[in-house]
A protein has these predicted regions:
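C-terminal motif of bacterial Sec signal peptides marking the signal peptidase cleavage site
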Residues: 17-20
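An aromatic- and glycine-enriched ligand-binding surface/loop that stacks and positions planar moieties
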Residues: 22-83, 155, 159, 210, ...
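Conserved, well-structured interaction surfaces
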Residues: 40-58, 77-152, 168-209, 374, ...
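Hydrophobic helical h-region of N-terminal Sec-dependent signal peptides
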Residues: 9-14
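Short edge-strand/loop segments of extracellular domains
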Residues: 161-166
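Bacterial N-terminal signal peptides that target proteins for export
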Residues: 1-8
Length: 420
């Protein structure tokens, strides 16, 4: 009997130790924040939102970078050929190519977690800022959708982070006609416009109300002109050869007018604020004097270190070597123009100083100037052409006042895309 009691005691102790062990293991990790706890404060939303900024910007890679996007258009050309224009060479990717939904899923996950808590008033912090960061995420989703939209047109409209269940994924993957996708993007931006602050925490390094309106105008104008100039083709709902199953009552005139009206209204909201607030172009060949004081605000707006003071700049990226946010673009442009340059048509789109186009009678333009080189070609033009045109190859001066142990800033006596 005594042994039996001993066995029971030992067994009870073992069971107790196992239970306490399970209790010890069944705890939230101390080195990580769980989803249930993360979206509970203003700072959480701020961090998540800015981590989902996917805007195409200048990075630290060598080359012309972002500004090569216009290559192979009527405005800009590179020194290499592009197979895009060769029949049969523009092929569908063998894998998923650009069909990537990770960014949109990240936004949808945010809304799944945050919107119920926001409606319950369960997120701590400054409520104006909380509301603002939710607005930022609507812009993030709209932007990510717009990036896909310009590549594919018809898209699935997905508003939640879907589970890994085949049936649900297949149903949600059905593509909607492009005009419905564009309307969905604009609806997201309207939600953002209602929630965003004019002057957000972080200044113009973060999304603001005006940024949402700017993107709103761009999306609307893009879709209006696309549907207008592709009417009746396979690239719009119901057009000849359109691969969609159901145009769902698509009316080209109604859609085109809707998107044009949206573009006009959104543009006007921003433009009205800029009246009398644009940077002045004082028409000087240099942007700063010897003391590095701006003598041409329009010029220095494109090469300043701090863009907060320029009303017409709605959002900008701050480069900071200590934070590892750097760029090699200026060096590349100075050295060889980044292997890219403006087309003759682009240059000749700039007016003469007297306000007349180069082809007009009385403009004063001489076509023979083109034979003499860039300097002669751009003479007597709108001064903005000279600011953004490198007019001498391999010839520039560095102002020593720009160089210190802390920072390297260069002023080129001969413009080399100084504004970029």
């Amino acid at each position: 009997m005594k042994n039996y009691i001993q066995y029971l005691t030992i067994g009870a102790l073992l069971m107790g130790s196992l239970t306490s062990c399970n209790d010890f293991l069944d705890r939230e990790p101390l080195d990580k924040v769980t989803p249930e706890k993360f979206f509970s404060a203003e700072a959480d939303l701020a961090a998540y939102a800015i981590n989902n900024y996917k805007f195409v910007t200048v990075d630290d890679k060598y080359g012309i970078n972002l500004f090569g996007k216009d290559n192979d258009t009527d405005n800009q050309a590179s020194g290499t050929s592009n197979s895009f224009w060769i029949p049969g060479e523009k092929k569908v990717a063998a894998d998923r190519g650009e069909w990537k939904w990770e960014d949109i899923r990240s936004c949808n996950y945010f809304f799944d977690q945050v919107l119920p808590r926001y409606e319950e008033g369960a997120i701590t912090g400054n409520q104006d800022n909380v509301k603002h960061y939710i607005g930022e995420m609507y812009v993030n989703r709209a932007y990510s959708y717009f990036q896909l939209f310009t590549k594919f047109g018809d898209l699935p409209i997905v508003t939640t982070a879907l589970p890994d269940i085949q049936g649900e994924l297949v149903e949600a993957s059905k593509r909607q006609p492009r005009h419905k996708v564009a309307r969905f993007i604009i609806e997201d931006l309207k939600k953002a416009e209602d929630m965003l602050l004019n002057n957000p925490p972080g200044g113009k390094n973060r999304i603001s109300k005006n940024v949402a309106y700017l993107l709103h105008a761009r999306v609307a104008l893009y879709e209006a002109t696309w549907e207008k100039y592709h009417r009746g083709t396979a690239f719009v709902p119901g057009g000849s050869g359109w691969p969609g199953k159901d145009a769902q009552g698509y009316d080209a005139d109604v859609e085109i007018n809707y998107f044009l009206d949206e573009a006009i209204a959104a543009s006007k909201f921003v433009a009205d604020q800029m009246v009398g607030n644009l940077a002045e172009n004082t028409d000087t060949p240099e942007g700063m004097n010897a003391s590095l004081v701006s003598i041409n605000p329009y010029y220095t707006m494109f090469c300043d270190e701090n863009m907060e003071g320029y009303k017409e700049i709605l959002m900008w990226k701050k480069f900071d070597e200590s934070l590892g946010v750097t760029s090699n673009l200026q060096m590349e442009l100075c050295r060889n123009g980044g292997g890219s340059g403006w087309t003759r048509g682009m240059v000749n789109s700039f007016l003469m100083r007297n306000g007349l186009p180069v082809y007009a009678s009385g403009s004063g333009y001489n076509p023979d100037w083109e034979k003499e080189g860039v300097v002669a070609t751009v003479q007597n033009r709108d001064s903005r052409l000279g600011i953004f045109t490198k007019n001498s190859i391999g010839e520039y001066e560095v102002n020593p006042a720009f160089i210190s142990d802390v920072e390297r800033r260069y002023q080129f006596a001969l413009s080399a895309f100084n504004g970029v």
